Amino acid sequence: MELIEQVSVAKKANIYFEGKVASRSVFFSDGSKQTLGVVLPGEYEFSTSQGEIMQVTSGSFEVLLPDSTTWQTFSEGSQFELVANVSFKIRNSAIAEYCCSYL
Protein backbone atom coordinates (compact mmCIF):
# COMPACT_ATOMS: atom_id res chain seq x y z
CA MET A 1 0.00 0.00 0.00
CA GLU A 2 1.36 3.40 -0.97
CA LEU A 3 1.15 5.96 1.84
CA ILE A 4 0.96 9.75 1.87
CA GLU A 5 2.74 10.96 5.00
CA GLN A 6 2.84 14.17 7.05
CA VAL A 7 -0.38 15.67 5.70
CA SER A 8 -3.64 17.10 6.99
CA VAL A 9 -6.89 15.50 5.82
CA ALA A 10 -10.30 17.18 5.72
CA LYS A 11 -12.78 15.37 7.97
CA LYS A 12 -15.71 16.14 5.71
CA ALA A 13 -15.90 14.37 2.36
CA ASN A 14 -16.72 16.02 -0.95
CA ILE A 15 -19.88 14.21 -2.09
CA TYR A 16 -21.07 14.30 -5.71
CA PHE A 17 -23.75 12.64 -7.83
CA GLU A 18 -26.03 11.64 -4.94
CA GLY A 19 -23.19 9.92 -3.09
CA LYS A 20 -21.90 7.90 -6.03
CA VAL A 21 -18.61 9.84 -6.07
CA ALA A 22 -16.82 10.87 -2.87
CA SER A 23 -13.39 12.33 -2.21
CA ARG A 24 -11.29 13.64 0.66
CA SER A 25 -8.97 16.62 0.42
CA VAL A 26 -5.37 16.07 1.51
CA PHE A 27 -3.25 19.14 2.33
CA PHE A 28 0.55 19.16 2.25
CA SER A 29 2.87 21.40 4.29
CA ASP A 30 4.00 23.20 1.11
CA GLY A 31 0.40 24.38 0.52
CA SER A 32 -0.40 21.92 -2.26
CA LYS A 33 -3.52 19.76 -2.24
CA GLN A 34 -4.66 16.42 -3.63
CA THR A 35 -7.99 14.66 -3.48
CA LEU A 36 -8.43 10.92 -3.00
CA GLY A 37 -11.70 9.64 -4.40
CA VAL A 38 -13.94 6.63 -4.80
CA VAL A 39 -16.30 6.29 -7.77
CA LEU A 40 -19.21 3.86 -7.83
CA PRO A 41 -20.24 2.37 -11.19
CA GLY A 42 -21.84 4.89 -13.54
CA GLU A 43 -21.13 7.73 -15.94
CA TYR A 44 -20.26 11.21 -14.69
CA GLU A 45 -19.29 14.60 -16.09
CA PHE A 46 -16.80 16.80 -14.25
CA SER A 47 -15.40 20.29 -14.83
CA THR A 48 -11.99 21.63 -13.87
CA SER A 49 -11.24 25.04 -12.40
CA GLN A 50 -7.47 24.48 -12.56
CA GLY A 51 -5.13 22.00 -14.18
CA GLU A 52 -5.27 18.46 -12.80
CA ILE A 53 -3.47 15.14 -13.04
CA MET A 54 -5.83 12.23 -12.41
CA GLN A 55 -4.10 8.99 -11.40
CA VAL A 56 -6.16 5.79 -11.25
CA THR A 57 -5.26 4.06 -7.97
CA SER A 58 -7.57 1.04 -8.28
CA GLY A 59 -9.89 -0.34 -10.93
CA SER A 60 -10.24 1.45 -14.25
CA PHE A 61 -12.09 4.31 -15.91
CA GLU A 62 -13.14 5.00 -19.44
CA VAL A 63 -12.54 8.70 -20.03
CA LEU A 64 -13.89 11.05 -22.67
CA LEU A 65 -11.31 13.82 -22.67
CA PRO A 66 -12.13 17.38 -23.79
CA ASP A 67 -12.38 17.80 -27.56
CA SER A 68 -12.35 14.02 -28.05
CA THR A 69 -15.02 11.75 -29.48
CA THR A 70 -13.32 8.51 -28.43
CA TRP A 71 -13.43 7.00 -24.95
CA GLN A 72 -9.98 5.96 -23.63
CA THR A 73 -9.39 3.37 -20.90
CA PHE A 74 -7.14 4.23 -17.96
CA SER A 75 -6.33 1.37 -15.58
CA GLU A 76 -4.71 1.22 -12.15
CA GLY A 77 -1.37 3.03 -12.19
CA SER A 78 -2.13 5.12 -15.29
CA GLN A 79 -2.96 8.82 -15.37
CA PHE A 80 -4.26 11.60 -17.56
CA GLU A 81 -3.83 15.37 -17.44
CA LEU A 82 -6.45 18.09 -17.81
CA VAL A 83 -6.09 21.83 -18.27
CA ALA A 84 -8.17 24.41 -16.40
CA ASN A 85 -11.76 25.22 -17.34
CA VAL A 86 -12.67 22.11 -19.31
CA SER A 87 -15.26 19.36 -18.91
CA PHE A 88 -14.64 15.64 -19.23
CA LYS A 89 -16.60 12.44 -18.66
CA ILE A 90 -15.71 9.23 -16.88
CA ARG A 91 -17.54 5.94 -16.74
CA ASN A 92 -16.82 2.70 -14.95
CA SER A 93 -18.56 -0.63 -14.47
CA ALA A 94 -16.98 -1.43 -11.08
CA ILE A 95 -15.84 0.61 -8.09
CA ALA A 96 -12.67 2.56 -8.91
CA GLU A 97 -10.43 5.00 -7.04
CA TYR A 98 -8.30 7.98 -8.02
CA CYS A 99 -5.80 10.51 -6.74
CA CYS A 100 -6.15 14.00 -8.20
CA SER A 101 -3.18 16.39 -8.06
CA TYR A 102 -3.76 20.06 -8.82
CA LEU A 103 -1.36 22.00 -11.04
From Swiss-Prot:
CDD domains: cupin_PpnP-like (cd20296). It is an enzyme of class 2 (transferase). One of its GO terms (molecular function) is guanosine phosphorylase activity. It catalyses: a purine D-ribonucleoside + phosphate = a purine nucleobase + alpha-D-ribose 1-phosphate; adenosine + phosphate = alpha-D-ribose 1-phosphate + adenine; cytidine + phosphate = cytosine + alpha-D-ribose 1-phosphate; guanosine + phosphate = alpha-D-ribose 1-phosphate + guanine. It comes from the Bacteria. Keywords: Glycosyltransferase, Transferase. Its EC number is 2.4.2.1, 2.4.2.2. GO terms for cellular component: cytosol. Belongs to the nucleoside phosphorylase PpnP family. Catalyzes the phosphorolysis of diverse nucleosides, yielding D-ribose 1-phosphate and the respective free bases. Can use uridine, adenosine, guanosine, cytidine, thymidine, inosine and xanthosine as substrates. Also catalyzes the reverse reactions. This is Pyrimidine/purine nucleoside phosphorylase. It comes from Shewanella sp. (strain MR-7).
